[in-house]
């Protein structure tokens, strides 16, 4: 116990400069003995150093991305060739995207004789249900690499009990049952009940790299998108993240929302611009372009779309000769209901992708953006031998707007 020293005179009490306290989640991952990557993004997760992971039996590295520290846990996991990881269960949700390799996953409830087994390949997305045992198996002669996302940070920070997280016998039977079709692939497209955009209910998506995506057009012309809905979660705009694709030569409108969104590149390559909203919609024109962050990535890379606690504009660009596909990688529910895209308590919410900031939305429409954005994008496309395909009509002010 530290001794408190009362100040004298008018001096303030306590340390004037002190080290930041680590959260329970940070303390947990720092004790795991594997590398921890900190930053805004990664060009390619295959390039991250991996350390031997005693708890799971493979190799891995944690990702502690800016703005996601208390919201979303992430790690890269290598399953050795011809081997399997140790089985585990925990009281938080977890999802996996396969970067490289093929294998199977076994899932079962404690005390149950029923075991679900399904196969995965590059581009597979699947869920490990809360507090269900799961084990990853690699039957090939080369290592498999997977990227995981979960909501361990808010769970560990809230309960502050490792025993509760790892040794809890509660059966979440409304979230995971014994039905044979729990991991049956579903291809039926429906509408999100809140926002009306495309969605699919499934717990296993065999190939999100090549799956057909419906036209959406909200984020950019020709933009395609679908939201995965997983079992046991209320199917609205808060759950599942989304899989999206930009055509060659096109880019998104800049927009902002709370932190937590992590975009993982599935195909093609691109870059993301990030800047604080305080810099305004035209930071380069205002002479503040040096304060804008840029993150490059290819298939297997990723970026924290809204770092710094949120309130950052971010904008995504396809510099491939073909389609540029990403997944907004969800890690499970957190303390924010309504998702990171909705704020306030109004009954009606304006779609942040459709309404510009002058209309009460959270998007910089193409006619409002800084001219530097388009000029730089044209330059990057030329360097890649790709063409600019944005319709010129996108940059015209609507009638009556000045």
Regions found by a protein language model. Give the residues of each.
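His/acidic/aromatic-lined binding-pocket segments of jelly-roll/cupin-type domains
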Residues: 76-77, 85-89, 93-98, 117-118, ...
């Amino acid at each position: 116990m530290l001794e408190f020293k009362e100040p004298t005179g008018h001096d303030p009490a306590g340390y004037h400069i002190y080290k930041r306290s680590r959260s329970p989640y940070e303390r947990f991952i720092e004790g795991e003995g594997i590398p921890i990557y900190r930053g805004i993004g990664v060009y390619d997760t295959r390039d991250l150093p991996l350390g031997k992971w005693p708890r799971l039996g493979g190799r891995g590295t944690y990702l502690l991305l800016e703005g996601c520290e208390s919201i979303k846990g992430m790690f890269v996991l290598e399953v050795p060739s011809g081997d399997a990881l140790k089985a585990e269960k925990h009281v938080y949700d977890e999802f996996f995207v396969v970067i490289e390799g093929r294998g199977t996953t076994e899932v079962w409830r404690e005390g149950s004789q029923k075991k679900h087994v399904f196969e995965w390949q590059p581009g597979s997305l699947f869920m490990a249900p809360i507090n269900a045992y799961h084990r990853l198996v690699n039957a090939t002669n080369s290592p498999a690499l997977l990227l995981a996302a979960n909501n361990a940070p808010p769970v560990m920070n809230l309960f502050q009990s490792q025993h509760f997280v790892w040794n809890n016998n509660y059966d979440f039977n409304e979230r995971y049952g014994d039905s044979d079709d729990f991991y049956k692939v579903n291809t039926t497209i429906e509408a999100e009940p809140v926002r009306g955009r495309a969605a699919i209910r499934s717990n296993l998506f065999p190939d999100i790299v090549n799956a057909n995506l419906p036209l959406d057009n909200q984020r950019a012309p020709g933009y395609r998108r679908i939201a995965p809905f997983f079992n046991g979660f209320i199917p609205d705009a808060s759950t599942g993240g989304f899989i999206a694709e930009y055509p060659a030569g096109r880019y998104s409108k800049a927009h902002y929302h709370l932190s937590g969104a992590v975009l993982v590149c599935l195909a093609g390559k691109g870059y993301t611009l990030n800047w604080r909203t305080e810099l305004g919609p035209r930071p380069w024109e205002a002479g503040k372009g040096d304060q804008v962050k840029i993150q490059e990535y290819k298939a297997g890379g990723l970026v924290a779309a809204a770092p710094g606690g949120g309130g950052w504009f971010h904008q995504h660009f396809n510099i491939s000769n073909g389609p540029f596909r990403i997944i907004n990688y969800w890690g499970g529910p957190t303390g924010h209901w309504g998702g990171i895209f909705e704020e306030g308590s109004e009954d009606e919410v304006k779609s942040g992708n459709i309404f510009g900031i002058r209309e009460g939305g959270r998007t910089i429409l193409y006619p409002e953006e800084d001219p530097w954005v388009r000029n730089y994008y044209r330059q990057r496309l030329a360097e890649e031998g790709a063409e600019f395909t944005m319709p010129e009509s996108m940059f015209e002010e609507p009638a009556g707007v000045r």
